[in-house]
């Protein structure tokens, strides 16, 4: 960034770990980051018609956030959300959420042996448009009269480095069960307003509607699907010790 905070240049290193950029003379602030390492920041002064080098930059391994203690933890719905995004007529994105859900995480001594179970009330789907929500609850989509819940049981926790995890398990939706992996960023531990311990994470997954036989479709005159074939699911979760 330059002296007034504007981003001037960015990018990655070459295969040998070098990064070169041509910038006007002036004062700059530099930030270097890499997955699993603490960011490096420095100031640099570039003189007119000269080469400025920072030399070798060494990144320090980042300390991973503290993990939740072994035991049972509940999803705290007031400060959690389960949302989704779908494409509409190949252009806009429609955002929605489920307003009612519950879940428990059993943290093992070996964190990778942990397990979680989440139950979502299918009828609580909400896109802020009543007519659309009624259609999503109908047999064309979730068919909530026959399949009142969506359930995820995750039993494979794999550490991918830094604060990144993969949680793999079985998702049951619309009477069909498929293996799904949640790409998860663990955000660490904190304390709530009453001093209670909390842990938090963000997770995403991409679902293909046809995998769960949610296959209703209408085409526009040009052959463009009204509803896209994939759904992006986004979770922001806080957990508290069960008690």
Question: Which ranges hold each PLM region?
Answer:
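Low-complexity, acidic/polar, glycine-enriched regions of mature
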Residues: 2-243
